[in-house]
């Protein structure tokens, strides 16, 4: 077997990058020739975590079939979120914590999906199940992933298992989860140097909801006005993306990590679905969603329901 490439979704976040690294490390310990790679540029939060725990940025790839015949997916399963030539390779494994959609394989595979807040929480179990000790820096990366996905344990996606795993990993890494976590989240929330096109692609995922093609992008900030003061440009870029990608709906979610509220900006012919999904009224294509921070648990399910049929 050729080298196995391990990667998460396009527009990678901290869980996608850190879990690819951590799982590749486990697989190598178990005798597999594995390499973590990425499908896009890393964000400021992820960069902070990698530097803190002495990890190299995984290699960027646009295709995989040109160098391997086997891959492992972490932190995603939906085809449109994965590498473009996924159908040309064999998917050996999937380790994920999201809904299963638009995914099928020609061969049997190992599929581990759990309703937890982060892929790294599952990896913590896999290390234990395989009797492999987690190295200090790898533990730090896995902790970073959990902090990121759970917004420092405040997200409704966060489970007791995530909190328990984070405590274990923080002890191994030798850091205080709360103080380190806040520093890491703040590093990711500094959006001042980012252009609007960059903000729309930092953490964007495409979904099929009923017969609709939907993209949801999310950024975290300590002040939503950092983004919304550029609303005119946001509207223009959203409309451009809708046209170029053939989207029915593009939802841009700006999340305040201090108040745990989000502001959404909607564009596309199906924009009214946002009103139905969240029982809000769009004013200038914009609405505030109180207490909403999780795309996976609080945005995707009601929007999917609103776009049925």
From Swiss-Prot:
<feature type="binding site">
    <location>
        <position position="13"/>
    </location>
    <ligand>
        <name>Mn(2+) 1</name>
    </ligand>
</feature>
<dbReference type="InterPro" id="IPR001667">
    <property type="entry name" value="DDH_dom"/>
</dbReference>
<feature type="binding site">
    <location>
        <position position="75"/>
    </location>
    <ligand>
        <name>Mn(2+) 1</name>
    </ligand>
</feature>
<dbReference type="Pfam" id="PF01368">
    <property type="entry name" value="DHH"/>
</dbReference>
<dbReference type="InterPro" id="IPR038763">
    <property type="entry name" value="DHH_sf"/>
</dbReference>
<dbReference type="GO" id="GO:0005737">
    <property type="term" value="C:cytoplasm"/>
</dbReference>
<feature type="binding site">
    <location>
        <position position="15"/>
    </location>
    <ligand>
        <name>Mn(2+) 2</name>
    </ligand>
</feature>
<feature type="binding site">
    <location>
        <position position="149"/>
    </location>
    <ligand>
        <name>Mn(2+) 2</name>
    </ligand>
</feature>
<dbReference type="InterPro" id="IPR038222">
    <property type="entry name" value="DHHA2_dom_sf"/>
</dbReference>
<dbReference type="Pfam" id="PF02833">
    <property type="entry name" value="DHHA2"/>
</dbReference>
<dbReference type="GO" id="GO:0030145">
    <property type="term" value="F:manganese ion binding"/>
</dbReference>
<keyword id="KW-0963">Cytoplasm</keyword>
<dbReference type="InterPro" id="IPR004097">
    <property type="entry name" value="DHHA2"/>
</dbReference>
<protein>
    <recommendedName>
        <fullName>Probable manganese-dependent inorganic pyrophosphatase</fullName>
        <ecNumber>3.6.1.1</ecNumber>
    </recommendedName>
</protein>
<keyword id="KW-0479">Metal-binding</keyword>
<feature type="binding site">
    <location>
        <position position="97"/>
    </location>
    <ligand>
        <name>Mn(2+) 2</name>
    </ligand>
</feature>
<feature type="binding site">
    <location>
        <position position="9"/>
    </location>
    <ligand>
        <name>Mn(2+) 1</name>
    </ligand>
</feature>
<feature type="binding site">
    <location>
        <position position="75"/>
    </location>
    <ligand>
        <name>Mn(2+) 2</name>
    </ligand>
</feature>
<dbReference type="InterPro" id="IPR022934">
    <property type="entry name" value="Mn-dep_inorganic_PyrPase"/>
</dbReference>
<comment type="similarity">
    <text>Belongs to the PPase class C family.</text>
</comment>
<keyword id="KW-0464">Manganese</keyword>
<dbReference type="GO" id="GO:0004427">
    <property type="term" value="F:inorganic diphosphate phosphatase activity"/>
</dbReference>
<keyword id="KW-0378">Hydrolase</keyword>
């Amino acid at each position: 077997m050729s080298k196995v490439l391990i990667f998460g979704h396009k527009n990678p976040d901290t869980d996608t990058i850190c879990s690819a690294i951590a799982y590749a490390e486990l697989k190598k310990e178990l005798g597999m020739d594995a390499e973590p790679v990425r499908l896009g540029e890393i964000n400021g939060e992820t960069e902070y975590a990698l530097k803190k725990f002495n990890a190299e940025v995984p290699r960027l790839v646009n295709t995989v079939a040109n160098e391997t015949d086997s891959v492992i997916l972490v932190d995603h399963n939906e085809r449109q979120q994965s590498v473009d030539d996924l159908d040309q390779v064999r998917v050996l494994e999937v380790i994920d914590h999201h809904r299963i959609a638009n995914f099928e394989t020609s061969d049997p595979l190992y599929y581990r999906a759990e309703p937890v807040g982060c892929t790294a929480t599952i990896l913590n179990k896999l290390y234990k199940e395989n009797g492999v000790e987690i190295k200090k820096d790898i533990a730090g990366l896995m902790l970073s992933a959990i902090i990121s996905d759970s917004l420092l344990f405040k997200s409704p996606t966060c489970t007791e298992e995530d909190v328990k795993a984070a405590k274990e990993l923080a002890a191994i890494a030798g850091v205080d989860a709360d103080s380190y976590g806040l520093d890491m989240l703040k590093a990711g929330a500094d959006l001042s140097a980012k252009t609007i096109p960059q903000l729309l692609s930092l953490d964007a995922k495409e979904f099929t909801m009923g017969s609709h093609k939907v993209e949801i992008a999310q950024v975290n900030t300590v002040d939503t006005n950092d983004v919304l003061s550029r609303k005119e440009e946001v509207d223009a870029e959203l409309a451009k993306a809708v046209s170029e990608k053939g989207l029915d709906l593009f939802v841009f979610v700006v999340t305040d990590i201090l108040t745990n509220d989000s502001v959404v900006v909607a564009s596309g012919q199906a924009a009214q679905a946002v009103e139905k999904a969240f029982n809000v009224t769009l004013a200038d294509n914009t609405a505030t969603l109180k207490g909403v921070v999780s795309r996976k648990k609080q945005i995707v399910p009601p929007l999917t329901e609103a776009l049925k049929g």
